[in-house]
A protein has these predicted regions:
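Class I SAM-dependent methyltransferase Rossmann-like catalytic core
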Residues: 1-13
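Intrinsically disordered, low-complexity regions
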Residues: 8, 18, 35-38, 141, ...
Length: 191
């Protein structure tokens, strides 16, 4: 898709009811109907075929109202630079939804293309004013919420979930390797 065609697609999606959504690393399925997909694989059917580790992304500034990143951030070479790009392409107040394996999950380590093993606390980094100052005075996020998902053992997962809901920090420091989580689901909002 050319830049002109992408611009026309974004304009059409904006007239369909609000700012468009972007699905980074969309694969074969979009996170929401009508989302513009960006993926490195041509087979994905993404509107934007692009490697997330090439900067800048071929997307306009300040357009998207929602960004979905499901199981992509752990593959990025430079997460900080990637999040700066996410911020650049988003409108102020855009919602950013990120799902990634928790560091205690075996799934975090079984895929050899995973470059990072993340914790729930990772996403607080992007809300720190030092992040905005380090990258750009206009780059920052609010952390709307972060949760861990569990799966596999009803009793033990229930206990892990209960502990994590009471204190993510305590769970990650004391229980993560005993009661491993599956994924982290983070919801950020651009400032």
């Amino acid at each position: 898709m050319t830049q002109a065609e992408l611009g026309e697609l974004i304009a059409r999606r904006m007239t369909d009811g609000g700012p468009p959504a972007l699905d980074i690393g969309c694969g074969l399925k979009r996170a929401e109907p009508g989302a513009i997909g960006m993926d490195w694989s041509e087979e994905s059917g993404a509107e934007v075929v692009w490697d997330v580790d090439r900067y800048p992304w071929p997307l306009p500034d300040g357009v998207f109202g929602r960004v979905h990143m499901s199981h992509i951030i752990e593959h990025m070479d430079d997460i900080v630079r990637g999040m700066k790009e996410v911020h650049r392409v988003c409108r102020t107040g855009a919602d950013v939804f990120i799902t990634t394996p928790h560091f205690s999950s075996h799934n975090s380590y079984t895929d050899p293309s995973h470059r990072h093993h993340l914790s729930a606390a990772t996403f607080k980094y992007f809300t720190d004013r030092r992040f905005a100052t380090f990258l750009s005075p206009r780059c920052g996020f609010d952390l709307v919420g972060v949760e861990l998902t569990f799966g596999g053992n009803f009793v033990l997962d229930g206990l892990g979930r209960l502990i994590a809901r009471r204190s993510l920090k305590w769970y990650e420091r004391r229980c993560a390797w005993i009661l491993p989580a599956s994924d982290i689901r983070a919801h950020l909002r651009t400032l």
